[in-house]
């Protein structure tokens, strides 16, 4: 089938281009460090986002109406969070704002472990919304500023998206194993702090870039 052959060729061509981007990034230290940090804190972020409702229903026995309310809280607070972090990045740097955001994500993991009531879950959901969209948009913005100069960045952003999808897959796999071993999602949520910690350490290694960005801003 010519169509299948054509689609197959496109598939392998796309992966070859991603591989070339990967090889190129290996020679760019700042990008390599940033993507390493992005991967690890994305493992935590994407897993929490996907499992928040499951945590509420399975651990706290929340009803559907309560879970819907939590989602609405997250969405509304996310608007304010994005504005606050955008302002913070303007006054400092994207890298500094990401550090603050990832640190808050770590605190969320600890808070989730101790949540007992619907009210507490709403508060955690609100804080989640505050940092969710902000860290995601700041990460993408920072990545775009670090890319090598070229007319077409499509493949570079495809690589970024693949990294995010891999982080999601790895996170869900890890949580599945942890829950199977412990039988409690609370411990799984607490364990996610490890991924955020690794990501934060990587981002702290970008001090040189942060100073450079601050100088440029000033």
Regions found by a protein language model. Name each.
Residues 1-35:
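Juxtamembrane intracellular "pre-TM" segments in multi-pass secondary transporters
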Residues 80-94, 179:
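Helix-to-loop junctions at the C-terminal end of transmembrane segments
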Residues 177-196:
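A membrane-interface helix-boundary motif in multi-pass transporters
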Residues 96-111:
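Structural signature of the two symmetry-related core transmembrane helices
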Residues 113-125:
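Helix-loop junctions at membrane interfaces in 12-TM secondary transporters
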Residues 190-218:
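Multi-pass alpha-helical transporter architecture, strongest
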Residues 50-66:
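Short amphipathic helix-loop junctions that connect adjacent transmembrane helices
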Residues 134-148:
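Intracellular juxtamembrane helix-capping segments at the cytosolic ends
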């Amino acid at each position: 089938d010519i169509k299948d052959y054509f689609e197959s060729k496109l598939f392998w061509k796309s992966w070859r281009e991603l591989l070339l981007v990967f090889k190129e990034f290996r020679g760019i230290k700042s990008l390599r460090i940033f993507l390493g940090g992005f991967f690890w804190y994305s493992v935590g972020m994407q897993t929490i986002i996907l499992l928040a409702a499951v945590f509420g229903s399975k651990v706290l026995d929340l009803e559907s109406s309560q879970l819907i309310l939590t989602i609405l809280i997250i969405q509304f607070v996310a608007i304010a969070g994005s504005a606050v972090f955008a302002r913070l990045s303007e006054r400092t740097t994207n890298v500094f704002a990401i550090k603050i955001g990832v640190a808050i994500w770590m605190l969320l993991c600890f808070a989730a472990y101790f949540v007992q009531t619907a009210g507490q879950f709403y508060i955690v959901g609100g804080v989640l919304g505050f940092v969710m969209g902000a860290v995601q948009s700041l990460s993408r913005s920072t990545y775009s500023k670090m890319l090598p100069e070229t007319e077409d960045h499509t493949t570079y952003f495809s690589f970024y998206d693949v990294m995010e999808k891999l982080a999601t897959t790895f996170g869900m796999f890890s949580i599945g194993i942890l829950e199977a071993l412990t039988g409690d999602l609370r411990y799984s949520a607490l364990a996610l702090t490890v991924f955020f910690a690794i990501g934060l350490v990587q981002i702290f290694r970008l001090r040189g870039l942060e100073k450079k960005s601050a100088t440029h801003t000033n």
